[in-house]
From Swiss-Prot:
Xref: Pfam families: PNP_phzG_C, PNPOx_N
Protein name: Pyridoxine/pyridoxamine 5'-phosphate oxidase
Source organism (scientific name): Cereibacter sphaeroides (strain ATCC 17023 / DSM 158 / JCM 6121 / CCUG 31486 / LMG 2827 / NBRC 12203 / NCIMB 8253 / ATH 2.4.1.) (Rhodobacter sphaeroides)
Gene Ontology terms: biological process: pyridoxine biosynthetic process
Residues at which substrate binds: K53, Y110, R114, S118, R177, L178, H179
PANTHER family membership: PYRIDOXINE-5'-PHOSPHATE OXIDASE, PYRIDOXINE-5-PHOSPHATE OXIDASE
Length: 200
């Protein structure tokens, strides 16, 4: 298999991290933005942009409100998919897999690294629920600011999700739409990866 150059390597997470590092100085903003897909109880898909915060040795991590629609759908199905797409590189990575919570020390550390206003905002926002007005949201921000001051703890309803892939596809633009695609797949998280080149 002619998997060389930007596709070379035996570790798909290392390849993904390398592509992201390459995109960071070139994308106009948010090179770590992913389009995260879930399905509701009726099987109707939902997709939204969130920020990928970590590429681990065996997983991808993002953070959110556990009461949000995305979180409810993830915890109902235990599965999610996302795509990372970079116009500057003309490349993308697609991921499908199983999801688990990250609500321990790692989530605490990431929450603590955020700006104070973002930490207070996590307390103030009942994410995905109806909101009467922006004024009422700002009033809630003022209330939690008065309550916590400059040291708000991480809310129990806010934390991370770790996506452990069963499938990762790397795609790069090719001339005349003769793109390069390589798919890594495994049947379970304990299995090794099989790799195949796909038609454009």
């Amino acid at each position: 298999m002619d998997r060389t150059g930007i596709f070379a390597g035996d570790d798909p997470f290392a390849i993904a991290a390398g592509w992201l590092a390459e995109a960071e100085p070139q994308e106009p903003n948010d090179p770590n933005a992913i389009a995260l897909a879930t399905v509701d109880a009726a099987g109707l898909p939902n997709v939204r942009m969130v920020l990928l915060k970590e590429i681990e040795a065996e997983a991808f991590v993002f953070y959110t409100n556990y009461g949000s629609q995305k979180a409810v759908e993830i915890e109902t199905s235990g599965k999610a998919a996302f795509v990372l797409h970079w116009k500057s590189l003309r490349r993308q990575i697609r991921v499908r897999g199983l999801v688990e919570r990250e609500e321990g020390a790692q989530a605490d550390a990431y929450y603590a690294s955020r700006s104070l206003k973002s930490r207070l905002g996590a307390w103030a926002s009942e994410q995905s629920r109806p909101l009467a007005s922006r004024t009422s949201l700002l009033a809630e921000v003022a209330r939690v600011t008065a309550r916590f001051g400059t040291n708000p703890p991480r809310p129990a309803f806010w934390g991370g999700f770790r996506i452990r892939p069963l499938e990762i596809e790397f795609w790069a633009d090719g001339a005349f739409r003769l793109h390069d695609r390589f798919r890594w797949r495994r049947n379970s998280l304990s299995d090794g990866w099989s790799i195949e080149r796909l038609n454009p």
